[in-house]
Amino acid sequence: MKKSGSGKRGPPDGNHQSVAPEKVGWVRKFCGKGIFREIWKNRYVVLKGDQLYVSEKEVKDEKNSQEVFDLSDYEKCEELRKSKSRSKKNHSKFTLARCRQPGTTAPNLIFLAVSPEEKESWINALSSAITRAKNRILDEVTVEEDSYLAHPTRDRAKIQHSRRPPTRGHLMAVASTSTSDGMLTLDLIQEEDPSPEEPASCAESFRVDLDKSVAQLAGSRRRADSDRIRPSSHRASSLSRPWERPDKGAPYTPQALKKLPSTEKSRCASLEEILSQRDTAPAHPLHLQAEESPAPVPSQPGQLSRIQDLVARKLEKTQELLAEVQGLGDGKWKAKDPPRSPPDSQSEQLLLETERLLGEASSNWSQAKRVLQEVRELRDLYRQMDLQTPDSHLRQTSQHSQYRKSLM
């Protein structure tokens, strides 16, 4: 029988002959269709390396094979099964699909194994061989040293870049994003070796920009503080108290920021140090004098609990007075001896005393309830203020302590 010229891919090299075959066996190969049925012929197949040898009879030397196929020309090996066929051959067919690249002349191969287990074995072996053949082509690619890409900036001379001072826009952006407590540090460090061209003018312009930015930041902080004080004072004035005298208050006038001389400025300053002058400046807080202060404004839950205990004791005392007055009245009116009953003047005095005690008790009761309600409202107000400005509350405690005490 003549050898197939289309399937021949060249004589195998010495490396392939030295390698033991991975899989050998008899399978049936599809050779075309006849008039009535398909033509299947028994073939002896040897898988060695990335070559597949097919011959009509069992041979010891692969050179005597009629057909040799290079597995690098094939894409995959998979099972071939028809959807509506009930034949036993349908469970043992597998195919080698060629690559869909232009110029590929390798044919599609269809085989029929002896059993489905043998079919799976051939599929696994051929798939591994195809993968190795593809990788072998990639491994053979070599790159010469002359073809390396030259790095455009590796050998470039390095230039020492000096640090420029921050601009006014950068300082304003940092100041606008800073926190309310002013603990953010502004980096104002200049280089040790400034540019030889007009160093004094550069330093003077930098100081002027710094003074302007600090003055604007301090003014915005004072406006924010005055806005926080205004709703609290309005809230305190809305509370109705008979002993309150709002006409004797003095308005709060914030002092202007004292500009620091240029000799006292450090090269690295923080907002806390710059704005410390506002805390030390004299201020005139609002004083509200009261004839009587039942309890101080609570700043902690412990003080609120003490005020509640005081109110409870007042209530107990009032109840005791009421019980005592009621007992005295019952004892006087239920006396068995009519001649020993008190005269009209004594009964009137007793009634007056009882009315006075009841009036005091009711006034104490209403005053205690009013104080407790005001304390709760003030507590809610300070909680809202603390939620809005949690960081600035501690700094304003020392400045407005007298104002908070005078609210009661």
From Swiss-Prot:
PH domain sequence ranges: 20-131
Region annotated Disordered, chain positions: 1-20, 217-265, 389-408
UniProt signal peptide: none
Q: Which PROSITE patterns match?
A: PH_DOMAIN
**Is Membrane among this UniProt entry's keywords?**
yes
UniProt cross-references to Gene3D superfamilies, sorted A to Z: Pleckstrin-homology domain (PH domain)/Phosphotyrosine-binding domain (PTB)
Q: Which GO terms describe its cellular component?
A: cytoplasm; muscle cell projection membrane; nucleus; ruffle membrane
Could you tell me the superkingdom of the organism this chain comes from?
Eukaryota
What are the residue positions of the site described as Cleavage? 309-310, 344-345
Give the span(s) annotated as Interaction with capping proteins (CPs): 132-192
Briefly, what is this protein's role? Plays a role in the regulation of the actin cytoskeleton through its interactions with actin capping protein (CP). May function to target CK2 to the plasma membrane thereby serving as an adapter to facilitate the phosphorylation of CP by protein kinase 2 (CK2). Appears to target ATM to the plasma membrane. Also implicated in PI3K-regulated muscle differentiation, the regulation of AP-1 activity (plasma membrane bound AP-1 regulator that translocates to the nucleus) and the promotion of apoptosis induced by tumor necrosis factor TNF.
Q: What is this protein called?
A: Pleckstrin homology domain-containing family O member 1
Give the organism, scientific name: Rattus norvegicus (Rat)
| Classification lineage | Eukaryota, Metazoa, Chordata, Craniata, Vertebrata
